[in-house]
Amino acid sequence: MEYDYIIIGAGSAGNVLATRLTEDADVSVLLLEAGGPDYRMDFRTQMPAALAFPLQGRRYNWAYETDPEPHMNNRRMECGRGKGLGGSSLINGMCYIRGNAMDFDNWAKAPGLEDWSYLDCLPYFRKAETRDIGPNDFHGGDGPVSVTTPKAGNNELFHAMVEAGVQAGYPRTEDLNGYQQEGFGPMDRTVTPKGRRASTARGYLDQARSRPNLKIVTHALTDRIRFDGKRAVGVDYLQGEAKDVTSARARREVLLCAGAIASPQILQRSGVGPAALLNRLDIDLVHELPGVGENLQDHLEMYLQYACKKPVSLYPALQWFNQPKIGAEWLFNGSGIGASNQFEAGGFIRSREEFAWPNIQYHFLPVAINYNGSNAVKEHGFQAHVGSMRSPSRGRVQVKSKDPRQHPSILFNYMATEQDWQEFRDAIRITREIMAQPALDEYRGREISPGPEVQTDEQLDAFVREHAETAFHPSCSCKMGEDEMAVVDGQGRVHGLEGLRVVDASIMPLIITGNLNATTIMIAEKIADRIRQRTPLPRSTAEYYVAGNAPARKQ
């Protein structure tokens, strides 16, 4: 079996590459996915409101666990990653958030990353997107990713929470992906006009599946990348339950798109990574790159939960006897509660003046429940998810053996710096001030969590240690750049090797201010043009907000 390109991982990035590369009819592509198909009749992945379900099983979730996190009471924390066509876009929360313009301008300050500025990236965000209310300078109108905007008549709690943020002195913004990210406003979601999850399997692969030059193999677990000297020449993978590997050869390039946990793991297993680690595991060294698996970053978040005095929350939707009607309305009409991820409002603020752009993100949810669907409060309630955006803490991913079925050792090293603790204390206190605003007076009942007795720095820190959870945004473990810890250059090419790129969230040099999926897709769109040797899309000329001397909060 020989192909021009072999793509490892049919996730948010891999499906973009598979679709774009096979637009050239003379180019053959093999797309390998360790998980199974994205079954379109499975409401768990297709119904936006069911987003908690795929995280609970193993069919669509790798369900990794971290090593005991030293600053988090030594908890082993969950690290869910998507498995199946679509990757994490098949199980994520569907929030369409791109990050702040300053994130990309900051990336572009690093040598070799000059063309990753916001105005260089914006055309690729637009290329990927079809926004339901039409294109403008910031949004696309004919891309593969369906983006749905919140509509009039949605839950009144969304509007009350945004108003409360504005009353507390923070900006209002009409579009968190537009001119100004900073502030509170409506949040877009990756959902189709028919109310289905817009994974990259649906948006991208559906265009490409029928092409004769694309072969998709599911249940194909990559064992390792094969090299001839310093050149990647193919991939060995295990098909289904098979004990023997299947080999495929790549004439041009191997494209590793397995995500921030699996991509460094596959590189290390293939002999690319820190020499001491590979020697310890008796893995033959192909090329020493000390940064493979290092620089791991994530977002941590907490829930602040309140009882709701007015019976307008989604609590009734959690009761089994109401669910058949919700399911039927979604199935047949593509509308109703089932068609939304219920994260229809949120925002970004600066907790202190020293931050040049927002460092805290909010998601508002009109029900009191854990992200994975557990511990639902048995009454009407609402909550704010809040967390810091650019933690200075750094973790790592390390392969434990040559066995591709063994999960790696993962340590995020959450909350390792004083800045982390300061940001979370600030975030809880600011959230309480927002929740105390008049806009929420008719809704706000008692504080359920953390609870009104949790007030001192020590009490807040203890709450964070015990209750903060991942936002499922692992990234940066094979970072782009030119320094000694960089793994790839600005086009995703692995340093010191030929015919091998990494294209996924692992190559972000620094984590972005917001959810990762939209940016992961943009990265793949941008590098796809590089692989095809096409002229990059012309830079955008859109103007965008920079806070400058503007106060973080009006008094």
From Swiss-Prot:
Superkingdom of source: Bacteria
Q: Which reaction does it catalyse?
A: choline + A = betaine aldehyde + AH2; betaine aldehyde + NAD(+) + H2O = glycine betaine + NADH + 2 H(+)
UniProtKB keywords? FAD, Flavoprotein, NAD, Oxidoreductase
Q: What class of enzyme is it?
A: oxidoreductase
Q: Does the keyword Zinc apply?
A: no
Q: Which cofactor does the UniProt annotation name?
A: FAD
Pathway assigned in UniProt = Amine and polyamine biosynthesis; betaine biosynthesis via choline pathway; betaine aldehyde from choline (cytochrome c reductase route): step 1/1
Where FAD is bound, by residue?
4-33
Q: Which InterPro entries match?
A: BetA (IPR011533), FAD/NAD-bd_sf (IPR036188), GMC_OxRdtase (IPR012132), GMC_OxRdtase_N (IPR000172), GMC_OxRtase_C (IPR007867)
Q: Where is the active site?
A: 473 (proton acceptor)
- Listed SUPFAM superfamilies: FAD-linked reductases, C-terminal domain, FAD/NAD(P)-binding domain
* Purpose of the protein: Involved in the biosynthesis of the osmoprotectant glycine betaine. Catalyzes the oxidation of choline to betaine aldehyde and betaine aldehyde to glycine betaine at the same rate.
- Which protein family is it in? Belongs to the GMC oxidoreductase family.
Q: What name does UniProt use for this protein?
A: Oxygen-dependent choline dehydrogenase
What is the species listed in this Swiss-Prot or TrEMBL entry?
Serratia proteamaculans (strain 568)
What lineage does UniProt assign to this protein's organism?
A: Bacteria, Pseudomonadati, Pseudomonadota, Gammaproteobacteria, Enterobacterales
